[in-house]
From Swiss-Prot:
Gene3D superfamilies: 5'-nuclease (3.40.50.1010). Mg(2+) binds at D7, D98. Toxic component of a type II toxin-antitoxin (TA) system. A site-specific tRNA-(fMet) endonuclease, it cleaves both charged and uncharged tRNA-(fMet) between positions 38 and 39 at the anticodon stem-loop boundary. Does not cleave tRNA(Met), tRNA(Arg2), tRNA(His), tRNA(Leu), tRNA(Phe) tRNA(Thr1), tRNA(Tyr) or tRNA(Val). Overexpression in E.coli inhibits translation, leads to loss of cell growth and degradation of tRNA(fMet), these effects are neutralized by expression of cognate antitoxin VapB. Ectopic overexpression in E.coli induces the YoeB toxin, but this is not the cause of VapC toxicity. Belongs to the PINc/VapC protein family. This is tRNA(fMet)-specific endonuclease VapC. Its EC number is 3.1.-.-. Signal peptide: none annotated. The gene is vapC. Its cofactor is Mg(2+). The keyword Metal-binding applies. CDD domains: PIN_VapC4-5_FitB-like.
Length: 132
């Protein structure tokens, strides 16, 4: 059963094995983790714009082969719209992809795993964990 949705920065730390203890958490929870298709887009974008796109795309493919990639769906969009409206009311904007990942995780009742606490702590109604 899925419990965790990894944010993009957690994926990058895991891929780079920095800090080293994050790999252990990853390996212990692989069957309970997923990423959003939004995170996949960010990983592909980063690999494509890198100096070694073929190598980095292969690394991303290997990484995501161990995870379930959840499509961003209608419920995720509804939840994200609610989050965006609440943040606008409070005057505390958060990056659009972080809103989408939070909305996606919230729509599925999943915990967002991120070290980007500065952004995600401002988002109402989601659960977060920092594995770094």
């Amino acid at each position: 059963m899925l419990k965790f949705m990894l944010d993009t920065n957690t994926c990058i730390f895991t891929i780079k094995n920095k800090p080293e203890h994050i790999r252990e958490r990853f390996n212990l929870n692989t069957s309970r983790m997923c990423i959003s298709s939004i995170t996949l887009m960010e990983l592909i974008y980063g690999a494509e714009k890198s100096l070694a796109p073929e190598r980095n795309l292969a690394v991303v493919e290997g990484f995501i082969s161990r995870l379930e990639v959840l499509d961003y769906d209608t419920q995720a969009a509804i939840h994200t719209g609610q989050i965006r409206a609440e943040l606008a009311r409070k005057g505390t904007p958060v990056g659009p992809y972080d809103q989408m990942i939070a909305g996606h995780a919230g729509s599925r009742g999943l915990v967002v795993v991120t070290n980007n606490l500065r952004e995600f702590e401002r988002i109402p109604g989601i659960r977060i964990e920092d594995w770094c």
